[in-house]
């Protein structure tokens, strides 16, 4: 009986081996000579496995539990997935918090070392058409948690069509994801503490998607490192992107949380739902935007540190349209929004909790120029609510609720409509500039 059972087991094992050979779509990096000991350079072995999968027409290159040291960089061929053990993005804040998991304690961890001292150079992982990075931790062991950061190239670059980053922890890259020059990128379930830049989007002509991304100082909040990040870091940067979709994203502790800028390729338009920025010197900056707009809904913005903590800043260079709907703004900032440019900015059904600066006399929303719409919003402090500068071309301020008295300073020479606002106290007289 025992001999019979052994023969059955051997037969099953052989059948499994035959099946693997017959369908060579999965490649274990251990079979290509990786050490996974955190010391031996595994770059060449990983690339050999990736190239084998690419030559076969695609497949999954699997990196089992281990600490894989890289002195170089990787290129993931078309239709190849580089996958670690994680099915959901993990958390490793043990370097910051004693007793919690460290990045080398478990799972699949890539120790990245190439390019220290310069942002120039290839990304650690370059994804191409239909290729994916999934289920791994990227950790830069030579970055000092107690000092100003050393520059590195991008951790991940996304190229071609439909590249994807799924369930990846970028614990402490200098630059996170370069999502430029591709079509239909997908970034989902990504967490970590990118220090200088989190995600950069540009040169996108077919819809990119970013979902469930959370940047927080889990690796280090020590004064020298974290203050540098607060003075220099930008979490999400968008330049030319047509129909960008962003959903459920959050960042903490940056100079700018969300930045919309203009590159030589153009500007961004898109749908931004459930986005958040906490303890950023400026939560959201618009340098320029498309005429068909940035549609921002259910946002949560908090600013209270820095030389002039401001939730929203729309720059003089903006010519496009920006809409904030059902957003909340709190934290002892100086101002909720400072608006310039020739574009249109609208706030609808928003809640403004704190503003005014130390003296309490700065308006929540200060528009210097352009077109402004503020409708159905709640101002929860008895402080100056709105100031319209002389270069404001058009404005509608209607159906808002004010704590205390209405304090609207209208210096505009343009067409301004103010009405149907409700205040606790007697409304202040509307200046003669109301037209």
Model-based region annotation:
Residues 1-12:
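Bacterial N-terminal signal peptides
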Residues 28-29, 82, 418:
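Bulky hydrophobic/aromatic "packing anchor" residues in well-ordered structure
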Residues 29-64:
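Acidic Gly/Asp/Thr-rich repetitive segments characteristic of extracellular carbohydrate-active
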Residues 117, 135, 139-435:
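Extracellular beta-rich repeat passengers
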């Amino acid at each position: 009986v025992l001999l019979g059972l052994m023969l059955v087991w051997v037969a099953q094992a052989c059948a499994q081996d035959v099946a693997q050979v017959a369908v060579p779509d999965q490649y274990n990096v251990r079979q290509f000579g990786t050490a996974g000991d955190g010391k031996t350079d595994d770059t060449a072995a990983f690339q050999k496995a990736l190239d084998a999968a690419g030559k076969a027409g695609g497949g999954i290159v699997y990196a089992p539990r281990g600490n894989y040291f890289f002195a170089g960089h990787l290129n993931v061929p078309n239709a190849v997935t580089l996958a670690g053990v994680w099915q959901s993005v993990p958390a490793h804040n043990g370097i910051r918090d004693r007793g919690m998991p460290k990045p080398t304690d478990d799972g699949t961890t890539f120790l990245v070392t190439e390019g220290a001292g310069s942002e120039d150079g290839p990304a650690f992982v370059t994804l191409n058409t239909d290729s994916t990075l999934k289920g791994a931790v990227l950790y830069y062991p030579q970055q000092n948690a107690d000092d100003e950061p050393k520059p590195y190239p991008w951790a991940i670059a996304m190229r071609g069509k439909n590249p994807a980053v799924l369930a990846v922890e970028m614990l402490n890259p200098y630059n996170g994801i370069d999502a430029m020059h591709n079509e239909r990128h997908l970034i989902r379930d990504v967490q970590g503490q990118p220090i200088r830049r989190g995600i950069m989007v540009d040169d996108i002509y077919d819809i990119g998607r970013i979902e469930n991304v959370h940047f927080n100082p889990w690796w280090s909040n020590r004064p020298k490192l974290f203050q540098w990040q607060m003075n220099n870091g930008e979490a999400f940067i968008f330049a030319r992107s047509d129909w960008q979709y962003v959903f459920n994203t959050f960042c903490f502790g940056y100079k700018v949380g969300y930045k919309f800028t203009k590159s030589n390729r153009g500007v961004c338009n898109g749908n931004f739902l459930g986005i958040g920025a906490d303890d950023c010197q400026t939560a959201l900056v618009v340098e320029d935007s498309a005429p068909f707009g940035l549609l921002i809904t259910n946002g949560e913005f908090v600013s209270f540190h820095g030389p002039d903590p401001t939730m929203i800043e729309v720059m003089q260079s903006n010519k496009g349209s920006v809409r904030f709907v059902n957003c909340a703004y709190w934290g002892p900032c100086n101002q909720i929004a400072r608006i310039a440019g020739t574009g249109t900015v609208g706030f609808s059904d928003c809640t403004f909790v704190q503003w005014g600066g130390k003296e309490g006399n700065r308006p929540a929303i200060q528009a210097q120029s352009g077109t402004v719409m503020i409708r159905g919003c709640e101002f929860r402090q008895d402080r100056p609510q709105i100031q319209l500068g002389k270069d404001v071309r058009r404005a509608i301020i209607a159906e808002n609720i004010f704590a205390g008295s209405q304090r609207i300073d209208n210096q505009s020479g343009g067409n301004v409509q103010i009405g149907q606002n409700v205040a606790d106290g007697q409304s202040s007289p509307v200046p003669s500039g109301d037209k």
